[in-house]
Amino acid sequence: MAVSQEPDTPIALSVGEGELIGTSVVKAARPEVSLIELEIKPGGSVQPHLHKGHSDSFYVLEGEVEFYVGDEVVQGSPGTYVLAPPGVVHFFKNVSDEPARALNLHTPGGFVEYRRELETLHAAGEKPDTAFFERHDIFDV
C-alpha cells in the first residue's frame, strides 16, 4: 500500500516500503502525523533545535542513539522511546560504530515536506538558510 496524504485512507507498509527521501523512508505524510524511518550513520547527529508547533518523538529500532531532550540525556537502544514536546530543545547522535535506525514521529504532521525540500537542496549542492528552517518549524539553538 502506498503512502497516502489523505486523512481517511488506511496505511499498511512493510519494512522498507514507503517514499524514499535520501536514506529515510516516509511511512506517513498526513496533516495530523508524519512518520519517517531514519537511518543514522555512525557518528551521525542533528544540531540542537526545537519546534514551536509540533511534538517530535523517536522510537529506536536498531543501534545505539544518544538523545538529548531538555535537561535529560537518554541512552537509546532498541525499544527506547523519546518525546520532545513543542518548545523543548532536543537533538540526537549515533554513538556506535554501526548504523542505527529509528522511527521519527511528528504530531501534528507536515514535516515530510521539509525532508523533501532539504533533499532537493542537497542534490543541487545548495545549503538551506535560517528562513528555510524557520518555515518548517525548526529553530536552532
Identify what each model region corresponds to.
Residues 1-34, 120-141:
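A short, N-terminal "cap"/entry segment at the start of jelly-roll beta-barrel domains
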Residues 26-28, 47-52, 93-95:
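Short histidine-centered beta-strand/loop micro-motifs
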Residues 42, 53-54, 72, 88-89, ...:
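A generic "binding-loop/recognition-motif" signal
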Residues 6, 71-89:
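Short acidic-glycine-tyrosine-enriched beta hairpin
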Residues 36-51:
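Conserved short histidine dyad/triad with adjacent acidic residue
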Residues 53-65, 70:
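Glycine- and acidic-residue-biased ligand/ion/polar-headgroup-sensing regions
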